[in-house]
Amino acid sequence: MIRQFGPAEALFIIEAVRWTVLLSVVAFIGGGIGGLGVALARTAPSAWLRDIAAGYIQLFQGTPLLMQLFLVFFGCTVLGAGIDPLAAAAIALTLNAAAFLGEIWRGCIQAVPVGQWEAATALGMRHLSRMRYVIVPQAGKVGIAPTVGFLVQLVKSTSLASIIGFVEITRAGQIINNVTFRPFEVFGLVAVIYFMLCWPLSHLSQRLERRYGTVSR
């Protein structure tokens, strides 16, 4: 039976925002922790650490996020470990985010002027101390804007979780469209919600880039 697209249907989609936000936050925090490790490994003195981190980045940047979602969700099932769509989506997005954030932050670390590295070395600092007290604090300022910009992409990427059955905004829209057959109204609302989530972040990223876009020499 075909239903009308009314307030109740719109509310169902709007309520799914909490799951999109939850998934985005979990993936961003987890990806941030992993990304920091990847960035530090990419700039480590050890060649084998750099190679492992580079391989990780190439693996996740070189394959579609959709395939990564499939592999985590169905791979766990094949291995006999049942996993719900939220957990599968969180794992896949976290691993993906770690690769992208790691590369973003690697660029920020290497953007710190050579003079800062040389000054820290001249003071007798070891690599970890040099990174902790001199390099990372400066790289962090440069990295704020692109990190917020990546968060915008991450929020939009959560829509792919609908393919494994996780009911976020896009999946909620699909469910309502299947019973109302009003795709323009349904997905128009979905698009508006994504815009309302992402536009403030995009605006914030631009402001932060203007403020912290350079490293002092």
Sequence positions of predicted segments:
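Transmembrane alpha-helices and adjacent helix-loop boundaries
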Residues: 1-217
